Amino acid sequence: PTSFAAIEAAIDKLHNPPSMYGFVAPNKVDENFMSQVLEHVFLANGLSPVGSDGFASLDKQKTVEVLDFYKKIATASPPGELFWKQSREVYFAGKAAMIIWSPFILDELAGLRDSAPPTINDDPTSTELASKTGIVTTFGGPSNPSGAAWADIRYFGVTSDANTDVATQFVEYSMKDGYTATLSIAPEGKFPVRRGEVTDTAKYIKAWSKLPVGVDRKAPLS
């Protein structure tokens, strides 16, 4: 489902606790994970506190739509305090129909990490849950049908007291000849902001898509 309405309809169809919860949404307000998920829901409905002139006030109707939707998915979630760990565990046990999580979940979902295995069956290396999981990268609310994704861009910073010549060489290497190696550090959680070079505009996209992921076992990203 790629819209608030479609997700709500799926919850109405699939929510059957305690054997199956329609959703597992974070509710632990002092965890950054909930902030990220809630921000994604705000963006999905076309809301951001940042405007061209700095701070932008939130539209009341759009905000109410966001909060009503979040209340719906939170109500369809298991009881108790939920953040990244619990939400992943509930989904991996096959007890939740839907979850909002970062792509860092992908290698674990595929049974490639022993410390966070799928528990939907007795085989911690099983790809059964992965085969039954669909990935949605963007979704939209009633005030923003085109939807939005959530991401953060990572930057290199060079301090004023650093060896700036050496640091500059490292940054240049990391963003060019070493860019694929940079992406190879947990590639399931990254997406290349540099898609390629002039001579091959998809060079880094293609290289990234084939990088191995996993902790205790490896598999190609695609």
Model region roles, listed by residue range:
Residues 8-13, 17, 52-81, 124, ...:
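Glycine-centered hinge/linker elements that transmit conformational signals in sensory
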Residues 1, 48, 76, 161-167:
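Short helix-loop capping/hinge motifs at secondary-structure junctions, enriched
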Residues 22-25, 97-101, 134-137, 156-158:
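Structural recognition of the beta-strand scaffold that forms the well-ordered cores
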Residues 22, 97-102, 108-109, 117-120:
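Paired acidic/hydrophobic, glycine-rich loop segments that form the ligand-binding mouth/hinge
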Residues 5-55, 96:
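Extracytoplasmic/periplasmic solute-binding protein
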Residues 108-117, 121, 126-128, 141-222:
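C-terminal lobe and pocket-closing loops
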Residues 8-15, 39, 67-74, 88, ...:
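Non-transmembrane alpha-helical segments in soluble domains
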Residues 2-8, 79-93:
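Short helix-initiation/N-cap motifs at beta->coil->alpha
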